[in-house]
């Protein structure tokens, strides 16, 4: 059984059991911060934009962005078929794709590419980020992603063993340097939804 197949199995089980709704609730505050940052920028630009959500789950973030007046195209992609089934059942007008995210190759480009809790499931996230920057992201577009699994969040260190899934861990500065190495500009990071007992979601973003 391949590595990505194992990850898909876990998320299919979560979608079938309704755990995707819990994930939506648990990630809502961090994703709201991320989208507020990205959508404020799009509003200031004042032009219509396209949106891609990598690892979209049941599509809740994709739907929220689709509702934005300036959004003219929203696409959500996930490797778990049952997540995509759930997303399509709630579709407003956005589009959902079931695909292996390690090899996914869209034929269209986007102004805003967003991902929450996905990239560390890849064996080689740097390769994907290079493809995003070189082929998927429009000039002037933004890549933004959020991670709860990172070195400084010690609470997350046990997750690979708990879920029996390999995960790719880096320090915050290593993620920043990785994005800079792809050619992204103005790379910044922050901790979203940080509390006294939670290290927060690590958000990394840069523009093309």
Outline where the language-model segments fall.
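Class I SAM-dependent methyltransferase SAM/SAH-binding core
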Residues: 52-103
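Short, glycine-/aromatic-enriched active-site segment of Class I SAM-dependent methyltransferases
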Residues: 148-166
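Short alpha-helix
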Residues: 167-182
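A short glycine-rich, Lys/Arg-flanked "PGG" loop and its adjoining helix->strand segment in the class I
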Residues: 126-139
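Conserved beta-strand signature within the Rossmann-like core of class I S-adenosyl-L-methionine
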Residues: 140-148
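A conserved beta-strand element that flanks and buttresses the S-adenosyl-L-methionine
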Residues: 114
């Amino acid at each position: 059984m391949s590595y990505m197949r194992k990850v898909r199995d876990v998320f299919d089980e979560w979608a079938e059991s309704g755990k995707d709704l819990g994930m939506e609730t648990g990630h809502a505050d961090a994703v709201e911060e991320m989208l507020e940052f990205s959508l404020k920028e799009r509003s200031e630009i004042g032009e219509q934009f396209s949106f891609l959500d990598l690892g979209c789950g049941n599509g809740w973030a994709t739907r929220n962005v689709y509702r934005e007046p300036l959004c003219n195209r929203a696409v959500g992609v996930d490797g778990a078929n049952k997540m995509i089934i759930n997303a399509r059942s709630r579709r407003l007008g956005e589009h959902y794709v079931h695909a292996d995210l390690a090899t996914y190759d869209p034929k269209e480009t986007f102004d805003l590419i967003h991902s929450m809790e996905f990239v560390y499931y890849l064996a080689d996230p740097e390769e994907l980020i290079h493809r995003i920057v070189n082929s998927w992201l429009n000039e002037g577009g933004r890549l933004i992603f959020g991670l709860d699994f990172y070195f400084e969040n010690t609470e997350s260190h046990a997750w690979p063993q708990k879920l029996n899934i390999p995960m790719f861990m880096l320090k915050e500065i290593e993620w920043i340097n990785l994005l800079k190495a792809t050619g992204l500009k103005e790379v910044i990071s922050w901790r979203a939804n940080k509390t006294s007992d939670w290290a927060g979601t690590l958000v990394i973003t840069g523009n093309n």
